[in-house]
Amino acid sequence: PLMVFARDAPYALPMLQDAAYDVMTVDTTFDGREARNILATSARKAGLMPKQLQGNFDPALLQADNGSGQVEIESAVREMLTLFGPQKYIANLGSGLVGTEDPSKVACFVDCVHNFSEEEVACA
């Protein structure tokens, strides 16, 4: 798949979709539901299906020294997955890792994504 990450450029989502990217990454500043709606509207006008989204978990929650814990990570993951919805979505970060993350927090993020995704599938 052809993927693109346009930081701070949610206005560009329709143009990126039209440019034949398969997956658009949404940064931490933009709402997943809004991104989904923008792509759906743009695709409908073109008579196409909307493309896939990924993102936008805030990696600051994974920093070793920020005071966040499992509860905050779980809450943020659940909110992210709820906003983006289960279809055509890749759970990912809204920007890159910088090397100062707590490995146990990164593991918590991955586990939460798996657990909450399994819950969504079971409820479908």
Where are the predicted features?
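Catalytic-face loop-and-helix region of soluble metabolic enzyme cores
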Residues: P1-A124
